[in-house]
Amino acid sequence: MLDNDISTASALHHLSVPEAAFATGADAHALDRRRFLQLVGIGLGAGLVAGPGSSLLDTAFGNGDTSRAAGPIGAGDGILIVLGMFGGNDGLNTVVPINDSEYYAQHGSLAIPAGQTLPINRNTGLHPELTVLKEFWDNDQLAIVEGIGYPDPDLSHFNSMAKWMAGQTTGIPTSGWLGRWLDGYLSGSKDLFAAAEVGHSLPLHMLGESSWATAIPASRPSFGARSEERYQRQYQMVRNLSASSTDFWNRQIGQAFVDQLEVASEIAPAIPEELPSVDLVARLEVQARLINANLGFRVPSAGWGDFDSHAGQPDQHPLRMQELNGAIRRFYEVLDPAWTTRVTFMTFSEFGRTSQSNDGAGTDHGTTAPHFVFGSNAQGGLYGERPTLAGLGRWGRMAHHVDFRDYYGSVIDGWLGGGSSEVLNRSIEDLGLFASAPGGTAPNGPIPDEPTGPPGVSVVAGSNGYRPAVRLSVES
């Protein structure tokens, strides 16, 4: 039995592959998936982890078909970048109610003075570090959805994270909402490049019933991507193992590594050896470069934290906002501008924080929080309803006004081509978050050597100087 108050890291640990439990295949000779990942972890740790929708593990688990697609994105296809803010983000200090006296009374010393925020109207300001999002707002390309949550909220990291990742509030989740979208999108075909988690494991929301995303580390693949003669000899030995071995185990593991070699050879040219030192910045740069390479990725995802600021929030939260801002800026510095009408970002977190600060200069697990959808095709504005803070005591929690599944469904239908009712097993209320469908022609030219950035978003790094203890660099 899991402790209801396990840490953010522990919750992610249990809700990600390879730590999640896997059902073994019907083939009596098939490897247990968890054991397989342990056996080949050294090789995969330097390259990729993929699921049953890919040739990499399908072959290893005796599931047959080794075909996979690595093709350019289709005409009119949108690319959705999903950012997980793990630990529970303080929504009140992200989208600040600058004219609400209750906010300043309840948040106390944690509250951000109105004059230090980035105002978007007379009642609301963005966190002072979110300068890039302010630029999107000024271009009518930032949708802020306030009051997102679900009925009877759970304050456990694990339980609430599982609900948000699964896209369901009841039952034991066996798949995630984006994974189920991937099931429908692929319709049984094999495509390793349709969705990717830039990280070292696959979180629940990227796992479908029949298809999974691919996990790509925020680094250049080394296994399978080295050109030196001695490495090429080693790679050939692996190929020979798969081709000639009569031993089932050697043949299956060897074939999995052959797939790994082939995948690395396609991805490695898009990723430089030197990446930014800040983790989220590096992850979003990898995403931008994979999009530039036009391999067919529809849903790149990444998560970071820790946002679980029970103490020391004045030092922690500004850094998280600074990381987010720097990562988005770096993404658009690297992205070929021809892709901007194809890309939309969205954020999620398992819950918000309490309106009342605690004695440790922090906040505790809350319920509702605002989230962002932004990009050149987003319909800028405020959506949903800001929860009232009136009458909330020390352990009072804000009421939600937008079901998180309506938030998800609005993105699925408005940006990914539809199918929300199948993915979420319910009808949704469309929030109308998009001004236009994905547009523009995918570029066919070479990947740009130098970052350029899209029109309307400055590529000059910087911050307005709001009190973080450490300055972050987005340089390589």
Features from the language model and the residues they span:
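Anion-binding catalytic surfaces of enzymes that hydrolyze or transfer phosphate/sulfate esters
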Residues: R239-L335
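N-terminal secretory signal peptides
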Residues: M1-D32
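Structural recognition of the beta-strand scaffold that forms the well-ordered cores
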Residues: V82-G84, N93-T94, A143-E146, A195-E197, ...
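Feature marks hydrolase-like catalytic cores characterized by long aromatic- and Gly/Pro-rich stretches
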Residues: L2, S7, V96-P97, G108-T131, ...
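Extracytoplasmic mature domains of secreted/periplasmic and thylakoid-lumen proteins
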Residues: A70, N123-E229
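Active-site-surrounding "flap" and adjacent substrate/cofactor-binding loops of secreted or lumenal enzymes
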Residues: G76-I79, N89-E135, N139-A143, L155-M165
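Pro/Thr/Ser/Gly-rich low-complexity, intrinsically disordered linker/stalk tracts
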Residues: G445-E475
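N-terminal export signals
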Residues: R35-G62
